[in-house]
């Protein structure tokens, strides 16, 4: 009987110690895109010629895990859900996503706060200071800012708060899954 208890205890310890738990969880903003994520239009402003935006839009739509995200490019910014521009921002900031209501009033700026209410559209500004940086060329900054426009807050993976990474971080399952929790499908 004593050997049986030791054997069972040994198995229990082996299971507990041999099991890894993924503690990473993507997080969301209190407010999200009010029009949902199935049929989002975007526009590239004339200054947003770098950042690999079109490719990064596709990287969010077509993941190995599937999602109902559908984003299409539009020739102007009338009624779009996400607009892309570039401007000079402070050093260390690769891009900023600002959030607006249906009356074109800014309700939150990515520089200082997250949207606390649902927003009608988002405006992404790339920092011209980093137009030649590897994180801009490989699309990491665009991918990160698109995540914000979809309602995802800073966490790990592609949503880590950093412009200095040279790693081409992909859209991961945690960030794909949070879209399901936010918008449902």
Provide a role label for each language-model segment.
Residues 1-2:
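N-terminal secretory signal peptides that target proteins for export/translocation
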Residues 5-11, 18-50:
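Disordered inhibitory propeptide/activation segment of secreted metzincin zinc metalloprotease zymogens
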Residues 9, 146, 150:
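Short glycine-rich loop/turn motifs that provide flexible caps or phosphate-binding loops at active sites
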Residues 15, 150-154:
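A generic secondary-structure signal for well-formed alpha-helical elements
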Residues 26, 111-137, 153-185:
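Metalloprotease/metallohydrolase-associated module, dominated by Zn2+-dependent proteases
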Residues 50-57, 172-176:
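A structural signal for well-ordered alpha-helical scaffolds and beta->alpha junctions
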Residues 52-142, 149:
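Metzincin-family zinc-dependent endopeptidase catalytic domain
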């Amino acid at each position: 009987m004593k050997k049986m208890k030791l054997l069972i205890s040994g198995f229990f310890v082996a299971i507990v110690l041999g099991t890894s738990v993924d503690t990473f969880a993507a997080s969301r903003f209190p407010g999200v895109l009010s029009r949902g994520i199935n049929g989002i239009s975007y526009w590239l402003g004339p200054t947003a010629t770098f950042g690999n935006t079109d490719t990064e839009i596709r990287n969010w739509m077509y993941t190995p895990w599937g999602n109902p995200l559908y984003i299409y490019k539009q020739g102007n910014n009338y009624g779009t859900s996400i607009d892309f521009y570039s401007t000079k921002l402070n050093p260390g900031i690769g891009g900023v996503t600002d959030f607006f209501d249906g009356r074109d009033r800014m309700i939150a700026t990515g520089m200082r706060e997250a949207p606390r209410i649902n927003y009608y559209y988002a405006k992404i500004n790339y920092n011209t200071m980093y137009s030649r940086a590897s994180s801009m060329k490989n699309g990491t900054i665009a991918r990160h800012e698109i995540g914000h426009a979809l309602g995802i807050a800073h966490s790990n993976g592609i949503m880590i708060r950093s412009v200095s990474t040279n790693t081409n971080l992909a859209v991961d399952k945690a960030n794909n899954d949070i879209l399901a929790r936010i918008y449902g499908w």
